[in-house]
């Protein structure tokens, strides 16, 4: 396990968040983000 500086940890957390958003198929997982459909969480196109 690599223990970096606070900056490194922040960057890693950010990358993990980006990966989560990229592979999230549930619109409500992140408000307004990560949806794999043209609809938002209110089902408005």
Swiss-Prot record:
Single GO term (MF): endo-1,4-beta-xylanase activity
Keywords (A to Z) from UniProt: Carbohydrate metabolism, Cellulose degradation, Glycosidase, Hydrolase, Polysaccharide degradation, Secreted, Xylan degradation
Keyword Hydrolase listed: yes
GO terms of biological process kind: cellulose catabolic process; xylan catabolic process
Signal peptide: none
Pathway: Glycan degradation; xylan degradation
Subcellular location(s) per record: Secreted, Extracellular space
Catalytic activity line of the entry: Endohydrolysis of (1->4)-beta-D-xylosidic linkages in xylans; Endohydrolysis of (1->4)-beta-D-glucosidic linkages in cellulose, lichenin and cereal beta-D-glucans
GO cellular component, one term: extracellular region
Disulfide bonds: none
Keyword Hydrolase among record annotations: yes
Domain of life: Eukaryota
Record EC number: 3.2.1.4, 3.2.1.8
Record's function text: Has xylanase, avicelase and cellobiohydrolase activity.
Family the UniProt entry places it in: Belongs to the glycosyl hydrolase 10 (cellulase F) family.
Protein name, per record: Endo-1,4-beta-xylanase Xyn10A
Source species: Gloeophyllum trabeum (Brown rot fungus)
Lineage, uppermost ranks: Eukaryota, Fungi, Dikarya, Basidiomycota, Agaricomycotina
């Amino acid at each position: 396990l690599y223990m970096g500086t606070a900056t490194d940890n922040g960057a890693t957390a950010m990358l993990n968040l980006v990966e989560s958003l990229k592979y999230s198929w549930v619109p409500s997982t992140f408000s307004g983000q990560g949806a794999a459909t043209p609809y938002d969480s209110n089902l408005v196109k």
